[in-house]
Amino acid sequence: FPFSKDIIFEVDSIFKVDLKNFTKIYVFLDEKSMFALKKKFEKYIKNGGVVYSYVYNLPNTTGREIELSNGKKLFIYKQ
């Protein structure tokens, strides 16, 4: 993946933060949390954002699935 020199990492509660100022988000959440955030993530993706989720997928949402060298999966959701 291409990386920019302008990367800023912010750590915050994904349940509280407004995602409109972010172009990409990276999460490692359990199934329950992914389900709870489904609508928020779908809106974010629809508005051009990209969600990278390590191990857990976004329920009933089409995305790209990559198997990593450690055997775990990375799910990528974008428009």
Can you say where each PLM-predicted feature lies in the sequence?
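Weak global preference for isoleucine
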Residues: 7-8, 14, 25, 45, ...
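A short SAM/SAH-binding and catalytic strip from SAM-dependent methyltransferases
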Residues: 15, 19-36
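C-terminal substrate-binding/active-site "lid" region of AdoMet-derived donor-dependent transferases
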Residues: 32-79
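S-adenosyl-L-methionine
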Residues: 1-21
